Design a protein with these regions (language model features):
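Beta1/beta-strand and adjacent pyrophosphate-binding region of the FAD-binding site
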Residues: 5-19, 36
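Helical element adjacent to the flavin cofactor pocket in flavoenzyme catalytic cores
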Residues: 144-202
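Glycine-rich FAD pyrophosphate-binding loop
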Residues: 28-49
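Dinucleotide-binding Rossmann-like beta1-alpha1 core, especially the glycine-rich loop
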Residues: 53-131, 251-256, 262, 294, ...
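C-terminal catalytic lobe of FAD-dependent flavoproteins
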Residues: 154, 251, 290-422
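Glycine/proline-enriched, intrinsically flexible loops and inter-domain linkers
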Residues: 384-491
């Protein structure tokens, strides 16, 4: 790919991972051919290249589920368009439950999937072990099977998008570092690179784990931080079924997929760590991180119990690589406030392969139409306050997002990290009265008050939580007599 730069473009895309290549592909396919993508090193060399490649359609919201569903459609079509095989295998997926709470959550997810026309159905233990014969089913209550899920090759998929972008007229330049996004009068005017300046009407920050620092130069908050993420690949396993479904054991914190006659299994860590707290090395390209055995031993023991063949199979690859996680588990996707023409797509929480095609299309459609073409409000960059893009906060908060990936997704679940940052003058007085605090945009706000003899801690449920009656009593007291409500955090 050429590194010769043009002087002007309608759109400059920064970052050659799956997100940047997806935006370029969908803009060019939509008729916007005056598009140039700039990559500091080589395509996929940041975090895309080492992704596990899982493709699961059911995500945490309507928008992200729509992204993933579209992604599966594109995976089945893009080879015919570009000649590049994305390595998609529609093996299906199975998610298992080891307790009643998890089983209830999986059944709720299956109901949610059906709203999108995604096939999902319950499997009992006998059916699960028939499809996943290597599993120890002790303690498994059942699971959910999604036949249209699968996996893809991250590099091949990204290269397919890049090839499609070029076929439709976009330009891709590697080994070009963007040093600054240029602005004037509250809107972008272009970018300054180490090889010259490009004037542009729109700039898209798809910088992955570099996106935060790039955005900070222009006062654009991109609340993400790189965290260490492990996976292991076994030696070849005789007679391993090639059509083995992707397996997710949320309670064990593990996911599994067949990988060319081997098993790849990764972890949603119980004790996640931020990476590059002093900055990402300038030379970073296709790099891996040191593998620290103590960081994964707890989850590895659970993995060996769940799939006993690990106890007698060698490990070929011990891998640790950086993945970007956001402060609240949501993407940052959209136009930055007060910076007309500055768009961001980053912080996708290790879902880039399954969400990249759809997220890139959503942003490309927004740029071409001049407005969002679907509800993307949950990802709005305007939700981010300045302090939420600061390093100290993100280094504490973002690893919790990784930890919670496979935790129970309770309604109203409270984060435990980076708490107590913003308090009103009434904080201590209300705490003395039994306030159980919840956090909203950093503010500690009483969710309910515990009566004498009750500890003010949240419990969680898909039904009425244990503190429901206490909250009901407060509501009645305010309705029938009087109450004091602290609104000082609203300014």
């Amino acid at each position: 790919m050429t590194s010769h730069l043009t002087e002007r473009a309608s759109v400059v895309i920064i970052g050659g991972g799956i997100m940047g290549c997806s935006v370029a592909y969908h803009l060019a396919k939509g008729g916007w051919t005056d598009v140039i993508l700039l990559e500091r090193k080589t395509l996929t060399s940041g975090t895309t290249w080492h992704a596990a490649g899982l493709v699961g359609q059911l995500q945490g919201s309507h928008a992200t589920t729509a992204f993933a569903s579209y992604g599966v459609e594109l995976l089945q079509e893009i080879e015919a368009e570009t000649g590049q095989n994305p390595g998609f295998r529609r093996s299906g997926s199975i998610s298992i439950a080891l307790n009643d709470e998890r089983m209830a959550e999986l059944k709720r997810k299956a109901d949610f999937a059906r709203l999108f026309g995604v096939e999902a159905h319950y499997m009992d233990t006998a059916q699960i072990v028939e499809r996943w014969p290597l599993m120890n089913v002790d303690g498994v209550l059942g699971g959910i099977h999604m036949p249209s899920d699968g996996s893809a090759n991250p590099i091949d998929l990204t290269q397919a998008l890049a090839k499609g972008a070029r076929l439709h007229g976009a330009k891709i330049c590697e080994h070009v570092k963007v040093e600054e996004v240029l602005t004037s009068g509250g809107r972008v005017t272009g970018v300054r690179t180490d090889q010259g300046t490009i004037l542009a009407h729109h700039v898209v920050n798809c910088g992955g784990m570099w996106a935060r620092d790039l955005g900070r130069q222009n006062g654009v908050g991109v609340p993400l931080h790189a965290c260490e993420h492990y996976y292991l690949v076994t030696e070849p396993i005789p007679d391993l079924p090639s059509d083995l479904p992707v397996l997710r054991s949320y309670c064990d914190g593990t996911y599994w997929k067949e990988d060319a006659g081997k098993l790849l299994f990764g972890f949603a860590h119980f004790h996640a760590k931020p990476w590059a707290t002093n900055g990402i090395p300038e030379s970073f390209e296709f790099d891996s991180l040191p593998f620290v055995e103590e960081d994964v031993m707890e989850v590895l023991q659970l993995a060996m119990n769940r799939v006993p063949v690990l106890q007698e199979t060698g490990i070929r690859t011990f891998f640790n690589g950086p993945e970007s996680y956001s402060h609240d588990g949501r993407f940052t996707l959209g136009e930055a406030p007060d910076r007309k023409g500055y768009f961001v797509l980053a912080g996708v929480n290790s879902t880039g392969i399954q969400s990249g095609a759809g997220a890139g299309k959503a942003l490309a459609d927004w740029i071409m139409a001049g407005h969002p073409t679907m509800d993307l409000s949950e990802m709005d960059p305007a939700r981010i306050e300045d302090w939420q893009a600061r390093d100290a906060y993100l280094q504490e908060r973002c690893p919790e997002t990784l930890v919670l990936t496979y935790a129970m997704h309770w309604p109203g679940r409270q984060r435990q990290s980076a708490r107590g940052l913003r308090r009103t003058p009434f904080y201590h007085a209300m705490k003395a009265r039994g306030a159980a605090y919840a956090e909203v945009q950093g503010w500690e706000r009483p969710g309910w008050f515990a009566p004498d003899g009750v500890t003010p801690n949240y419990d969680h449920s898909f039904h009425r939580p244990g503190w429901f009656d206490h909250m009901l009593a407060e509501q009645r007291a305010v309705r029938e007599t009087a109450g004091l409500i602290d609104y000082s955090m609203l300014g």
